[in-house]
Design a protein with these regions (language model features):
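Alpha-helical transmembrane helix bundles of large polytopic membrane transport and channel proteins
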Residues: 2-106, 419-483
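Internal alpha-helical transmembrane segments of multipass membrane proteins
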Residues: 164-195, 207, 270-273, 541-563, ...
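Hydrophobic transmembrane alpha-helices and their membrane-interface caps
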Residues: 189-236, 565-610
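Pore- and gate-forming transmembrane helices of large, multi-pass membrane proteins
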Residues: 194, 246-278, 617-639
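Transmembrane alpha-helices and their membrane-interface boundaries in multi-pass membrane transporters
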Residues: 210, 220, 226-242, 258, ...
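Interfacial helix-loop-helix hairpins and adjacent transmembrane helices
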Residues: 251, 255, 296-350
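Juxtamembrane segments of multi-pass membrane proteins
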Residues: 335-457
Length: 639
């Protein structure tokens, strides 16, 4: 498939030869930790280990191997790599693992030519792989295939999103069309809504790109606010035209609602612009996008809709009797006008008392079970999980990085003994300084090993004790680094780093403390915890900005209406926020960043409803119809 830039299966004969030759030529420089430990104290332990290999019926030591490598350094390094690589081993050129039932599994590794989030390319690849799997099982019914990789999740997510959009999108569109037609007896209001929303979204996108040069994912999420709020502007004006179109001109209708629209826009934009104070690009982009987008939508209504709404059917208010009874009850029945807000306030307090916060990003996704099951099976077979948790050891040069890694290995062993991690993997490469130390150990231990072999009745051997240095660049360019290269990082300025993946992490905080114990060059990375902390920080900041925005709106209302009426006008907005959080808590959901983003939308829409109802030039009946229609449209569009 063209989607794959590289596919690695069996190692051919030439590659195997090159692989073996590299280890042979550099065996004195690739001494593994177990061999190093056996070489201590004169090398007696190494001598006994060599004899155990010779007399073992399963080791397969040949006379040629003993003559060429009497210290068995190459054998030791290969056994150490097999241990480090967990359950994978080389067999007939393949990386192979075996399950408890005795079945052999062969590893195929592919690298994408492009991004795993290129939806079209990934779907084509997954389709091709599924076809190949069917062909394989047709030819070999007993064959089994397991797959894992980001591409499988991204394709599943994109296809699921397309399905949701096609199903829910069609239902939403039909619902909005039916609602608009039922109320206005025309599709023109729907077209006018689309125009104002589209211009707002376009203006917001252009402004964001001009200022920031890119569009953050959070900005796209918040584009929903432009849909919800800008639709209110259009529907308020069109409702006024539908009810009073025979009595006044389009421009006179605009004059009745202009101040309310501008005040709603000013208040909402001020609330969003306060979020520019946040130090996070995502929230700042969101503020610019919403402020510019809503301004463009409102100005479209003010300057274009009076021209475009000519010929709009004029008809009485739908469900007029019901709305009039509601308005009358609200004015005359104190139990309703006081009791309902009090009841909602009590409901909000009761719900918010059960509120819990959860910034765990894993709770935001529903992983497909069939893909997750395959990933777990591969992890069990290989012993290598895909947890994005690792230490990063870095330095100004490759040798400094390797020296720091060697010192840090002791801490990793202690963490493993204490149960903080179940395992870790380090690249099988020694620093030049460590290679010199190993060569000294070899020279010291060689006489002991030679004597032990002679005492066992074997022919005299003569170990090659010359230096066989391995530099990082040579190792990276050799077949010996296959499967390890991705763990080594090199920057253009010469700085380098190496990843040390760990598994079975019990406490990310304790591992962070281990990294902090070193003066420099060691960093702990837990991608999930990092995102959890980032989302929590965003949530804290957004909560503060939301409260500041509410305070600014309150000050504006008090300055415009006085203390009493100003504070009363805030009651609907505060209750809407409180009830939203209460419903969230009572439904068993936790508060997270996206809950706060939804509250920003609720606040923006709630302010519109309050200002439309308080418009002195509008009639309560028209305002009630406009707000009801805007609410239903928003629920259909966002629900």
């Amino acid at each position: 498939s063209a989607a794959l830039g590289d596919v690695k299966g069996p190692m051919d004969a030439a590659s195997q030869q090159a692989w073996g030759a590299f280890f042979w030529q550099h065996r004195n420089g690739l001494v593994d930790p177990d061999t190093r430990a056996r070489l201590q104290n004169g090398g007696e332990a190494q001598a006994q280990w060599i004899l155990s290999q010779l007399y073992s019926a399963f080791s397969g030591v040949s006379g040629k191997e003993l003559q060429n490598d009497p210290l068995m350094l190459m054998r030791g390094s290969q056994l150490a790599m097999a241990k480090n690589g967990q359950r994978l081993r080389l067999m007939d050129g393949w990386l192979v693992t075996q399950d408890p039932q005795g079945n052999y599994w062969y590893l195929l590794h592919g690298e994408l030519a492009g991004s795993s989030f290129d939806m079209q390319q990934t779907h084509q690849l997954i389709t091709t792989l599924n076809t190949l799997e069917k062909d394989l099982k047709t030819r070999y019914p007993q064959a089994q295939l397991l797959s894992r990789g980001t591409v499988f999740y991204s394709d599943y997510a994109s296809q699921q999103a397309k399905q949701d959009i096609s199903n829910l999108g069609v239902a939403t569109l039909l619902g909005v069309i039916l609602l608009i037609v039922a109320v206005f007896r025309s599709l023109r209001p729907l077209l006018l809504c689309v125009i104002s929303i589209g211009i707002g979204a376009l203006a917001g996108t252009v402004a964001t790109l001009l200022i920031f040069g890119e569009l953050h994912l959070m900005t796209l999420v918040m584009s929903m606010s432009v849909i919800g709020i800008s639709a209110d502007y259009t529907l308020y004006y069109l409702t006024e035209r539908m009810v009073h179109g025979n009595d006044v001109s389009p421009w006179q209708s605009l004059a009745k609602v202009r101040n309310a629209l501008l005040l709603a826009l000013l208040t909402t934009v001020a609330a969003y612009l306060i979020m520019m104070l946040a130090p996070f690009p995502g929230i700042r982009q969101m503020a610019i996008f919403a402020a510019v987008g809503l301004s463009a939508s409102c100005l479209t209504v003010l300057f274009w809709h009076p021209w475009l709404c000519r010929g709009l059917p004029v008809r009485p208010v739908p469900a007029m009797a019901l709305m009039l009874r509601w308005l009358a009850a609200w004015r005359r029945n104190k139990k309703l006008s006081l009791g309902l807000p009090v009841a909602l306030a009590l409901f909000s307090l009761a719900g918010m008392s059960m509120l819990r916060v959860d910034d765990d990003i894993s709770q935001l996704q529903a992983l497909p079970q069939h893909i997750l099951a395959q990933e777990k099976a591969i992890t069990a077979l290989t012993g290598q999980s895909v947890d994005q948790k690792w230490f990063v050891v870095y330095g100004d040069s490759p040798q400094q990085t390797l020296r720091r890694l060697e010192k840090f290995t002791a801490s990793l062993e202690n963490a493993k003994k204490e149960g903080l991690i179940s395992n870790y993997r380090t690249i099988p490469l020694n620093s030049l300084a460590r290679q010199e130390e190993d060569l000294h150990l070899l020279k010291t231990a060689a006489p002991t090993v030679t004597k032990a072999l002679q005492n066992a009745g074997l022919a005299a051997v003569n170990p090659d004790l010359n230096a066989m240095p391995v530099k990082v660049d040579e190792w990276l360019a050799s077949p010996a680094s296959e499967g390890w290269r991705l763990l080594w990082l090199t920057l253009k300025n010469g700085e380098s780093g190496v990843l040390v993946p760990v598994e079975g992490v019990k406490s990310s905080a304790l591992l962070q403390e281990i990294a902090s114990d070193y003066p420099g060059g060691i960093a702990w990375v837990d991608r999930k915890s990092t995102f959890d902390e980032l989302f929590a920080l965003y949530r804290y900041v957004l909560t503060g900005l939301l409260l500041v925005a509410l305070a600014v709106i309150a000050c504006g209302a008090v300055a415009r209406l006085g203390w009493r009426k100003g504070l009363i006008s805030l009651v609907p907005s505060v209750l809407s926020l409180g009830c939203g959080l209460a419903v969230l808590a009572m439904s068993g959901q936790a508060v997270n960043l996206f809950s706060l983003l939804a509250l920003v939308l609720v606040l923006g829409i709630g302010i519109n409803y309050t200002l439309f109802f308080s418009n002195p030039r509008g009639t309560p009946l028209t305002s009630l119809l406009a707000i009801t229609l805007a609410m239903l449209t928003t629920l259909l569009a966002l629900g």
